[in-house]
């Protein structure tokens, strides 16, 4: 066969280019790579060196946050679909290829944070981050600081991803090289009330600070229920296996797992430590007022020799195995103990109640994360979702929905977290919200959510098809549909229309504790919200002379991101925390005259004010929660 005849035959070796392009959004990057290696036809069609379509789709998958409500579904009123990040990067780097844009986002985007310092929530403390300068810290004295008032880079992995800047050797396959570096490439950052959640390109999930809950209950077990805790059970069983010593003088008991000022107790197993000649297990040992041991009433032996009593030094650490297991579940970023990796309970067979392979580990990979006030929700590569919602554990709980269709036919398309509840959009089911779940019992691998289905949100093609949704508190959900002419609110089992005097078709919404942001195809508006009730009189068009494409809100402050990669902030900076990122408090009030004191340490900035980044720096993603703000920032070369 001639070369010409061969080329003519090649299209018969696979699907047409249009069909392949249409299927790319439904394939993982590994699937696409494998498909490209199937034969010459697919290898040419999916050319990793020259295909714009391929790298554009790979960019969406890696950095588009398509599985959370950070980005809306593509609606009838949407133009060509673009994520916020790609809009900014195409504006800033119009001449780069999609492969170059992908590599720029992967290697040059660094995580910056600012705001309240308490509990290391920013990913660092005042003394642990070398990037901090004195003028960036708010506080009454050099030794006592409240917060960080300017965007500051967070200490992250210090390996070749820091210096590589997307330069590959001629022999390297760029996608494979990026995959190798995936553990250190930040794909998404989400902010809760007391921490940031950081998702890497490889699917690892991290959380900043010492607590994501702040000691507050999230949408976890109902009432006073508690999840099964294997660590607590192991400790209880270990301590029970040691005998207790009863004093004849006052009848008090002492657990022998404590430390004694004497010889280490004899025997290598707790059940034989006080048994002469391997007798049956001693349950109680009685000590008279002089300290001499005597047989416990009803005991099987007449006395315990004095040599079996501890007489010097503490016994061996009976908790060593538990401590080893806990250490395996607490992995920090190298060189930064203020950012820890987060795992699901299902990663550890220990939680199943089985004794075998206690140290084994199942590495679950996540593709999306969304944060609430004291909890967060993540989705894995198999379309399972996990909720970190308890003050008692740092491990996520797998969530299931009783009496709903299988994920195989009705997958979860997006996840979201409100102030005190979780929500997701399930194909042909609609919006599903819950603020409680069952407690996990021993041997169980998941918990059932106590959910509500938002009525009339299951349409997948028509006018009522959901385009975007936003979560407030107590299962209150705002949403918009394909028509784009109405804002809907679901609360207490009912859907209501919120009538507003706005211009344009609604295409995107954002909400937090006390605010609601509406995007139309021509304008951007803000509204105040109190206990789910919209203050219609507070409707305000954003006064920013740039096109705003993303907005994030904390408790009382808001940050906007424009298509040019600029940041603007306004609202209340509580307790001198620095969350607005506009500099020292005195400068905001006395020099720039853009804010006013409210009380002793609160500052209000009414008009959106530009956050000054270093020259040639742009922001590609912003998040906020509580009293802190975070952003992914790139230096333009």
From Swiss-Prot:
Effect of residue 372 to V: In saf1-1; impairs the protein stability
Matches recorded under InterPro entries: F-box-like_dom_sf, Ran_GTPase-activating, RCC1/BLIP-II, Reg_chr_condens
Low complexity compositional bias, start-end: 289-305
Domain F-box, chain residue ranges per copy: 14-63
Effect caused by changing residue 24 to P: In saf1-5; impairs the interaction with SKP1
SUPFAM superfamilies per UniProt: F-box domain (SSF81383), RCC1/BLIP-II (SSF50985)
Impact when changing residue 387 to F: In saf1-2; impairs the protein stability
Record bears the keyword Repeat: yes
Effect of mutating residue 35 to P: In saf1-6; impairs the interaction with SKP1
Record-linked Pfam families: RCC1_2
Annotated Polar residues bias: 244-260
UniProtKB keywords: Phosphoprotein, Repeat, Ubl conjugation pathway
Entry superkingdom: Eukaryota
ATP-binding found in the keyword field: no
RCC1 repeats: 109-202, 565-635
Self-association state and partner proteins as the record states: Interacts with AAH1, SKP1 and CDC53. Component of the SCF(SAF1) complex containing CDC53, SKP1, HRT1 and SAF1.
Function of the protein: Substrate recognition component of a SCF (SKP1-CUL1-F-box protein) E3 ubiquitin-protein ligase complex which mediates the ubiquitination and subsequent proteasomal degradation of target proteins. Targets AAH1 adenine deaminase for proteasome-dependent degradation upon entry into quiescence. Targets also URA7.
Protein name: SCF-associated factor 1
Species of provenance: Saccharomyces cerevisiae (strain ATCC 204508 / S288c) (Baker's yeast)
